[in-house]
């Protein structure tokens, strides 16, 4: 049952994200990491080596998906700025005064245009990172306790 549930979760997430966002690799790594974490927690005891390695693979997979998504968003953001030619014209001003640059961003409505993307990705990335850090500390502490 767990195997079929994991398979359906992976299949539906890949299909849905490919249809809507065309970025299946990021979501595949994210879901795969969560699947490894679920398998490690439900199938193995916390003192086994398989548990340790599955948790590490899961956490690395989730973190790598966050890095891939951050790089993708940065490149997308940079390309849009290049088209607007706002970054080059205001790069000298940005060093001198941040307030003038913020006024320019609001006047060209660039910040408002990217606000939904920032709101969509930043909280989920931070929450995923916090959960992964908590899980890693918890199982690493248990693993170190049982190996002594």
From Swiss-Prot:
The keyword Transmembrane helix applies. It is found in: Cell membrane. Its main location: membrane. The keyword Transmembrane applies. It is a multi-pass membrane protein. Keywords: Cell membrane, Membrane, Transmembrane, Transmembrane helix. One of its GO terms (cellular component) is plasma membrane. The chain crosses the membrane at residues 20-42, 52-74, 118-135. It comes from the Bacteria. This is Uncharacterized protein RP722. It comes from Rickettsia prowazekii (strain Madrid E).
């Amino acid at each position: 049952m767990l195997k079929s549930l994991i398979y359906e979760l992976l299949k539906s997430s890949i299909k849905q994200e490919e249809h809507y966002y065309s970025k299946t690799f990021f979501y595949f790594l994210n879901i795969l990491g969560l699947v490894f974490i679920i398998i490690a927690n439900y199938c193995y005891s916390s003192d086994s080596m398989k548990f340790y390695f599955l948790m590490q693979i899961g956490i690395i997979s989730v973190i790598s998906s966050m890095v891939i998504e951050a790089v993708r968003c940065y490149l997308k953001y940079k390309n849009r700025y290049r088209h607007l030619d706002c970054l080059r014209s205001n790069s000298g001003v940005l060093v001198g005064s941040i307030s003038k640059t913020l006024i320019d961003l609001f006047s060209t409505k660039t910040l408002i245009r990217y606000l939904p993307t920032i709101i969509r990705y930043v909280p989920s990335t931070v929450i995923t990172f916090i959960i992964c850090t908590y899980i890693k500390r918890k199982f690493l502490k248990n693993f170190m306790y049982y190996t002594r």
